[in-house]
């Protein structure tokens, strides 16, 4: 089967702006080089009015993790009588992954959203929950090598939504063109400070 991290393929990127956060992901599901489905795989989920979750990696673990975190976030809402914020979500996922470190989930999560004080938040972690929330962008998936250079070159602090959208489109399209394990369509989900979202489709190579 080869590298289990590359088995299903994925491309995921998150950018933190001045008044919005955005996640972009491809829509391909495959078994290594064999494409199984196109245009249907969701890797970006909305956990609350102020929090987005992106998951790249083995698709079975992606769906299992999402359902577990969705359940935990709903319980948090019931117990605390308020919606979970992205920093608390990141801590929750980190704890969940570390708990399963001896039989890990093969995923790379990216969490984006807004804290109660209105500040944007962006964090990511490895498969055992080591959290990194110190940068303006995060990347994950088999296309990471192709995403990294473009993000380091073009992503700046406090970018506006009008700057982020065309940049993410350019980055995800360029990366999926070079990675055989990802592509076949993509989309960008933008979350604004007022809780509104936009889901923008991106055309990519379909071969």
Curated annotation (Swiss-Prot):
Q: Which GO terms describe its cellular component?
A: cytoplasm; nucleus; proteasome core complex, beta-subunit complex
Q: Which residues cross the membrane?
A: none
As for subcellular location, the record says: Cytoplasm; Nucleus
Under the heading SUPFAM superfamilies, the entry gives:
N-terminal nucleophile aminohydrolases (Ntn hydrolases) (SSF56235)
Its main subcellular localisation, reduced to a broad class, is cytoplasm
Q: What is the superkingdom listed in this entry's lineage?
A: Eukaryota
GO BP terms? proteasome-mediated ubiquitin-dependent protein catabolic process
Q: Which UniProt keywords apply?
A: Cytoplasm, Nucleus, Proteasome
**Family statement:** Belongs to the peptidase T1B family.
Function, in words: Non-catalytic component of the proteasome, a multicatalytic proteinase complex which is characterized by its ability to cleave peptides with Arg, Phe, Tyr, Leu, and Glu adjacent to the leaving group at neutral or slightly basic pH. The proteasome has an ATP-dependent proteolytic activity.
The UniProt subunit note reads as follows: The 26S proteasome consists of a 20S proteasome core and two 19S regulatory subunits. The 20S proteasome core is composed of 28 subunits that are arranged in four stacked rings, resulting in a barrel-shaped structure. The two end rings are each formed by seven alpha subunits, and the two central rings are each formed by seven beta subunits. The catalytic chamber with the active sites is on the inside of the barrel.
Name the UniProt record assigns to this protein: Proteasome subunit beta type-3
What taxonomic ancestry is recorded? Answer: Eukaryota, Metamonada, Diplomonadida, Hexamitidae, Giardiinae
Q: Name the gene behind this protein.
A: PRSBETA3
């Amino acid at each position: 089967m080869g590298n289990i991290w590359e088995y299903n393929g994925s491309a995921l990127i998150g950018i933190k702006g001045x008044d919005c956060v955005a996640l972009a992901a491809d829509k391909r599901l495959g078994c290594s080089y064999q494409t199984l489905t196109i245009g249907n795989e969701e890797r970006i989920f909305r956990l609350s009015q102020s929090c987005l979750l992106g998951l790249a990696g083995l698709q079975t673990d992606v769906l299992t993790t999402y359902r577990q975190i969705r359940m935990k976030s709903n319980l948090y809402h019931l117990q605390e009588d308020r919606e979970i914020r992205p920093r608390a979500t990141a801590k929750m996922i980190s704890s969940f992954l570390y708990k399963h470190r001896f039989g890990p989930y093969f995923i790379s999560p990216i969490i984006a959203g807004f804290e109660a004080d209105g500040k944007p938040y962006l964090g990511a972690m490895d498969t055992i929950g080591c959290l990194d929330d110190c940068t303006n962008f995060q990347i994950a998936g088999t296309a990471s090598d192709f995403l990294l250079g473009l993000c380091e070159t073009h992503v700046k602090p406090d970018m506006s939504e009008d700057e982020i959208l065309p940049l993410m489109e350019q980055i995800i399209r360029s990366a999926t063109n070079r990675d055989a394990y990802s592509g076949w369509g993509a989309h960008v989900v933008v979350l604004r400070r007022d809780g509104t979202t936009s889901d923008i489709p991106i055309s990519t190579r379909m071969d």
